[in-house]
């Protein structure tokens, strides 16, 4: 039987979108995700009450479209906005147009190493991730298969989720296996702030009972000493893990924190780490128990496959940060990814709504904290761009 050749890539386009969606933090007033949450900027009183006050939402969403010669379009969304759109249009597009969509390994390699002198992590790798995800979406659509088929197929019949949001008690009602809360007070608020954190944890434990997971997302806000004291105090209330407690660049601090926390408590991080080389540092230095790459920020699916294999060899679980369908299609195929995160993007959060609403159509959500693999059985990542959202193409090439 002759091999069927897929159409080559004809066009790459990059757009920006404002408002809630792939930029998790670009939300309106009164949203739990922007309510006095501890951050590295909390040391400055002017930037303590709101994360938007220091510009957490300045980038907005990046939309990457990749069109094949037959008119099939793959797309993806991530955080990056106009600066990332410039990188996609002016630099990365040259490595895709005229190429076969099956050449994703070579394409990734060329995107990464051509930008290494000004990239390596952060915004540039966000842009690379968006392109890579759009490429996988295109490949799935051309082959009329869901992405998880292309990654080796499902290793279980369903996904199970924990929920991130300010109301773990509601997460329990919705059937999630656990609830991860934002930490509201950082070191600059002293002992009183630490006491408020513990009081909040104690109150939530009384609401959810002893058998429901409770975790803290510290969003890089702490130092090793404060994180250690917080973990020890939280142990009495059954905190399952302490997440991203310190700067993602402080591998030595994470190594120390992992030694310091009470026995049985997990240390997790990786949301703001990127590429196999960054995660290699976390694993070889034994910085954490669970790594949490965001597939839209760490290098895309192509790189996450390498990160996951490295983690498997080191006996570490991979539980990706957020990422909606881009994470779901990956987690369902990995033995060392036993559950997934669901970001509760309702402002309350008192309802289960699609993570990237309103930017995507057809985005599945957990039912009673679970999702059947059949919910992913559509070509590519199985979602469409909402035609009603305002997209802007700031650059061309």
Swiss-Prot record:
Involved pathway(s): Carbohydrate degradation; L-rhamnose degradation
Reaction(s) this enzyme catalyzes, per UniProt: L-rhamnonate = 2-dehydro-3-deoxy-L-rhamnonate + H2O
Full protein name: L-rhamnonate dehydratase
Cofactor(s) for this UniProt protein: Mg(2+)
UniProt subunit comment: Homooctamer; tetramer of dimers.
Feature type site, description Increases basicity of active site His: 294
Residues that coordinate or bind Mg(2+): 217, 243, 271
Annotated binding of substrate, by residue: 25, 51, 341
Primary enzyme class: lyase
Cofactor details (free text): Binds 1 Mg(2+) ion per subunit.
Gene this chain is encoded by: rhmD
Pfam families registered for this protein in UniProt: MR_MLE_C (PF13378), MR_MLE_N (PF02746)
GO biological process: amino acid catabolic process; carbohydrate catabolic process; rhamnose metabolic process
Matching HAMAP family: Rhamnon_dehydrat
Keywords: Lyase, Magnesium, Metal-binding, Rhamnose metabolism
Keyword Magnesium annotated: yes
UniProt lineage: Bacteria, Pseudomonadati, Pseudomonadota, Alphaproteobacteria, Sphingomonadales
Record-annotated active site: 321
Function field: Catalyzes the dehydration of L-rhamnonate to 2-keto-3-deoxy-L-rhamnonate (KDR). Also shows activity with L-lyxonate and L-mannonate, with much lower catalytic efficiency. Catalyzes the third step in an alternative pathway for rhamnose utilization that does not involve phosphorylated intermediates.
Additional information: Reaction proceeds via a syn dehydration.
Gene3D superfamilies membership: Enolase-like C-terminal domain, Enolase-like, N-terminal domain
Keyword presence, Magnesium: yes
Cited InterPro entries: Enolase-like_C_sf, Enolase-like_N, Enolase_C-like, L-Rhamnon_dehydrat, Mandel_Rmase/mucon_lact_enz_CS, Mandelate_racemase_C, Mandelate_racemase_N_dom, RHMD-like
């Amino acid at each position: 039987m002759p091999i069927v050749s897929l159409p080559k890539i004809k066009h790459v386009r990059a757009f920006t979108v404002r408002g809630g969606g792939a930029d998790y933090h670009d939300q309106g007033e009164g949203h739990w995700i922007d309510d006095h949450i501890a951050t590295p900027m909390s040391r400055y009183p002017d930037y303590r009450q709101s994360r938007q006050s220091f510009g957490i939402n300045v980038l907005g969403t990046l939309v990457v479209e990749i069109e094949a010669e037959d008119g099939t379009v793959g797309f993806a969304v991530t955080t990056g906005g106009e600066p990332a759109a410039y990188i996609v249009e002016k630099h990365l597009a040259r490595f895709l147009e005229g190429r076969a969509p099956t050449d994703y390994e070579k394409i990734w390699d060329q995107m990464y190493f051509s930008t290494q002198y000004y990239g390596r992590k952060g915004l540039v790798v966000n842009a690379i991730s968006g392109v890579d995800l759009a490429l996988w979406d295109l490949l799935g659509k051309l082959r009329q298969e869901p992405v998880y088929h292309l990654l080796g197929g499902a290793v279980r019949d369903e996904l199970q989720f924990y929920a991130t949001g300010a109301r773990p008690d509601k997460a329990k009602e919705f059937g999630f296996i656990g609830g991860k809360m934002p930490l509201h007070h950082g070191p600059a608020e002293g002992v009183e702030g630490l006491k408020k954190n513990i009081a909040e944890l104690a109150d939530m434990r009384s609401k959810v009972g002893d058998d429901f997971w409770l975790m803290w997302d510290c969003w890089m806000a702490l130092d090793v000493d404060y994180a250690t004291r917080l973990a020890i105090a939280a142990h009495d209330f059954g905190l399952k893990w302490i997440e991203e407690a310190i700067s993602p660049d402080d591998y030595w601090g994470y190594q120390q924190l992992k030694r310091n926390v009470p026995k049985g408590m997990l240390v997790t991080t990786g949301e703001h780490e990127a590429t196999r080389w960054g995660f290699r540092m976390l694993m070889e230095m034994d910085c954490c128990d669970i790594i949490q790459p965001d597939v839209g920020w760490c290098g895309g699916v192509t790189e996450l496959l390498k990160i996951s294999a490295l983690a498997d060899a080191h006996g570490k679980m991979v539980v990706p940060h957020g990422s909606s369908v881009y994470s779901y299609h990956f987690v369902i195929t990995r033995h060392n990814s036993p559950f997934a995160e669901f970001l509760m993007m309702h402002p309350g959060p008192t309802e289960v709504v699609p993570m990237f609403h309103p930017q995507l159509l057809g985005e599945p959500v957990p039912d009673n904290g679970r999702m059947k693999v059949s919910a992913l059985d559509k070509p590519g990542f199985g979602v469409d761009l909402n035609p009603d959202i305002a997209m802007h193409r700031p650059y061309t090439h």
